[in-house]
Amino acid sequence: MQAYFEQIEKVRYEGSQSDNPFAFRHYNPDQEILGKRMADHLRFAVAYWHTFCWNGADMFGVGSFARPWQQSGDALELAKRKADIAFEFFQKLSVPYYCFHDVDIAPEGNSLKEYLHNFAVITDVLAEKQQDSGVKLLWGTANCFTHPRYGAGAATNPDPDVFAWAATQVFTAMNATKKLGGENYVLWGGREGYETLLNTDLRQEREQIGRFMQMVVEHKHKIGFQGTLLIEPKPQEPTKHQYDYDVATVYGFLKQFGLEKEIKVNVEANHATLAGHSFHHEIATAVALGVFGSVDANRGDPQLGWDTDQFPNSVEENTLIMYEILKAGGFTTGGLNFDAKVRRQSTDRYDLFHAHIGAMDTMALALKAAARMIEDDKLNQLVAKRYAGWNGELGQQILQGKASLESLAHYAESHQLAPQHQSGQQELLENLVNRHLYPK
């Protein structure tokens, strides 16, 4: 097979002084950070959909890329060619993982029978390529939002036949993910929401999607899938309002249906932007609620109101992300999936390398800065000092349920309390962060 990226042999670490645009300047996979290899901290993955399925089309223009697997011809053979090139890319980029939707890797066909056949064929192709290359599957998922049948949602659709079709896709994709050794399975409700409340029964749709997720959990245990189930929050787009709005909303949903011990979250930076949150907020919230699982590493444009899915390039933003992840003990089954696409004008095939190399270097720099913050521990100490009172007798009585409003009122009166505000020292904390971002 002729190489598609014939100008590149393999992307390697060459250090910060390198001028080679096809080399890592900061991502050194074998460098030890806090007792663990950098590669094991970051667990990078390439997104099959944006990298190999998007053709450069947007709302105002047709596709601008000329990818050989996107030409006319036998759909299944083109899917095999796409897999060849995808694994060439993974290996030359030296990335350990990839992620996919079912219809990213295999043509959907014109019937359920064709879908199942095509998916089975390509699953076998990917299994062989994983065996040959050592590249692994971080997570799989099913696309239950693109086809016109899902115009009113999948699990929340008013037609139970559509619900059943979606269940078939998820059933098949979960089985394929298990077969391929996937470490997670993701559920993103692209159209699980509404465009108008005039034709929407909120209670009915919530019960439907709750039952759907319960069935997903049941199937996970039935087939013995050892990976983590993940829901990916997003507030809107393509619908006006989506039920998995943000991390806190997803947690409330999981609690309602008794799933908070079964499902975690896959947090995407750009989705946090759309929800009016910082990426830092969503990661910290997921950690605080005990549902942090994985990350879609990208960025949005604060001046635009849609999901731009750009590659991450802010060391400042991502240092705080990696700091939260390190404090929480790091990834277990999750990782950093680049749910990002090159710009429509970036039509050179090698732009795919520039995008991923830059993003991987960005996250490597962020990891190193976050590790310095962990080792220094001053930020953590200042936060602990701020809440130290809660470790005392009064604080513990309150938290342990041994105090009431009445007893606290008596305490305040008998001790003639006159508490004074203590400085939050935000500026000092920001200076501490900058000290580790720019150590020289």
From Swiss-Prot:
Molecular function in Gene Ontology: magnesium ion binding; xylose isomerase activity
RNA-binding listed as a keyword: no
Sites where the protein binds Mg(2+): 307, 309
Required co-factors: Mg(2+)
InterPro entries linked: Xyl_isomerase-like_sf, Xylose_isom_bac, Xylose_isomerase
EC number of this enzyme: 5.3.1.5
Localisation per UniProt entry: Cytoplasm
Cofactor: record remark: Binds 2 magnesium ions per subunit.
Catalytic activity: alpha-D-xylose = alpha-D-xylulofuranose
Keyword Metal-binding: yes
Enzyme class (EC, first level): isomerase
Alphabetically ordered keywords of this record: Carbohydrate metabolism, Cytoplasm, Isomerase, Magnesium, Metal-binding, Xylose metabolism
Family, as annotated: Belongs to the xylose isomerase family.
Quaternary structure and partners: Homotetramer.
Protein name in UniProt: Xylose isomerase
Record organism: Pectobacterium carotovorum subsp. carotovorum (strain PC1)
